[in-house]
Amino acid sequence: MDEMLILVDADDNAIGSQSKTRVHQQGLLHRAFSIFIFDSQGRLLLQQRAFSKYHSAGLWTNSCCGHPRWGESTLAAAQRRLQEEMGFSAELQQVSSFTYQAAVPGDLIEHEFDHIYVGLFDGKPQGAPEEAHSWSWTDIQQLTDETTRNPEKFTVWFLTIMKDLGANEMERWARLAAS
């Protein structure tokens, strides 16, 4: 069965639900989250999406991302998906939210009200193979350079966050996660 996503208005008020496939085909605004996990050295955990994903397969992105279920808080969903996707838990704190709309491969449209969470973890992730093909701890400045040189290797939402917020904000998030 196709996952149901929460449709929202411009202020993130729930206004209904729709199947994930239809949401991405029609570019409907829906609630989502993006998690940025840092280690004590200030490096960001990136995941390479599984090659079996129906969009953005094999692309590098932030540590974890997903959608809450109806009646589930965004924080609870973020904690659940971090465990399911990457095999660990971390204390998460919300640092921002934003709305974006972008075309993704496969004639699909991402249109998300995206809640951004940060956390600290110093272990080795145990990524679920159906979610994450690989992972890497990456220096923020090197990541900034890589996203500029090779944007085609990254998801549209991750590039949007990197472009809009930049390395200074990422470094601030790393310090916040460590505090």
UniProtKB/Swiss-Prot annotation:
Q: Which UniProt keywords apply?
A: Cytoplasm, Isomerase, Isoprene biosynthesis, Magnesium, Manganese, Metal-binding
* Residue positions of the active site: C65, E112
Annotated Mg(2+) binding sites: E85
Reactions the enzyme catalyzes = isopentenyl diphosphate = dimethylallyl diphosphate
Query: Sorted alphabetically, which Pfam families does this protein's record hold?
Result: NUDIX
- What does the entry list under GO cellular component? cytoplasm
E.C. numbers: 5.3.3.2
Question: What is the annotated localization of this protein?
Answer: Cytoplasm
The enzyme's main class, written as a single word, is isomerase
Q: Name one GO biological process term.
A: dimethylallyl diphosphate biosynthetic process
Cofactor binding comment, as recorded:
Binds 1 Mg(2+) ion per subunit. The magnesium ion binds only when substrate is bound.
Q: Give residue ranges for domain Nudix hydrolase.
A: 28-160
One GO MF annotation is:
isopentenyl-diphosphate delta-isomerase activity
Q: How does it assemble?
A: Homodimer.
Instruction: Tell me its family.
Output: Belongs to the IPP isomerase type 1 family.
Please report the name of this protein according to its UniProt entry: Isopentenyl-diphosphate Delta-isomerase
